[in-house]
Amino acid sequence: MTSYSSATARAEMSELRRLKSLLPPELQSWVMVEGSTEVNPPLIRSEELGRDEIEIQVDLAKWENLAIDQRNLLFWHEVARIQSDTIPREGWEMAALAIGLGGAVGELWVQDGLLLLLALGLCGISGYRLWQKNNGEKRIKEAIEADEKAITLATRFGYTLPNAYKSLGSAFKTLIEQTPNRRQRKQYETRLQALRQSAAKMKAKTQKAKAL
């Protein structure tokens, strides 16, 4: 049992080192790659640790069910999100919303109209920012853009365009099969459809260039 645990730990550390080597040189000094320690975490996500440090967290138990090429493209998707500055951040919105609501209740008690308006205004601004951050259409658009950039990153590491598209597409197909959450599965399906359209455009563009 102990030897099995040791072998698993070594395999996980080896995979984390391998993923670290897939970071572009300009990111290697400030982007960390670690195994997730949460209960039922997402497959892969990024978290801002400080102003100049980001950690990519991987659920290694689920991760090992994917082929190497699938892992690579999903990892580069996350890298692309970091490069595009679209990873989720712990913002001021929730704190501002709590302060605004608390202030509104307090000003209702003391009946100060101006301060009540200010508190309600703070609630409105922070609530709108929270809505923007969690807007489904915006998030899927950012994900599709990151998929495109992941393809480009793959070519920097030796993939041909057809192989990069094929690897990411097969990753989506696997995730669609393995994801029980209907909403999450729908997002993967949408991204797969967008990827197919992009691949078709790229193929047509390549064939046109060859014909010239």
Curated annotation (Swiss-Prot):
Coiled-coil ranges per UniProt: 180-212
Membrane topology: Single-pass membrane protein
The entry's keywords: Coiled coil, Membrane, Thylakoid, Transmembrane, Transmembrane helix
Pfam families: DUF3318
Transmembrane regions listed in the UniProt entry: 109-131
Protein name: Thylakoid membrane protein slr1949
Keyword flag S-adenosyl-L-methionine: no
Localization, UniProt: Cellular thylakoid membrane
Record flagged with keyword Transmembrane: yes
Cellular component annotations (GO), alphabetically ordered: plasma membrane-derived thylakoid membrane
Main location: membrane
